[in-house]
Amino acid sequence: MSVITIAELRAGVLAATDLTTRDRRLHTLTAALELDPVPIDTSVANHWAKLRVALRDRGLRMGVNDSWIAATALALDIPVLTQDDGFPTLDELRVLHA
């Protein structure tokens, strides 16, 4: 799991507007924190740079956080597991929707 994912989950807890949502998000964050987060290293940074250029060349957009999560997945050769629709279709990026 990317450190960016941890940050997004934590922000989701902080942004919750009701206790039910907060508790559900906190449960997800707590489970995620049991995993060792993948740091942003040189390999992830290189994949991020290539991804940004590929997106630009194809006229596609991706949020900054999503692009770091995608770069982490590319560096590890694993799919992105998401509930988010922010990942454009790219041959090199495998995306699984939960």
What feature does the model see in each segment?
Residues 1-75, 89-93:
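PIN-domain endoribonuclease scaffold, especially VapC-family toxins
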Residues 82-86:
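Short, polar loop motifs at secondary-structure junctions
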Residues 98:
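Conserved acidic donor-binding segment of nucleotide-sugar-dependent glycosyltransferases
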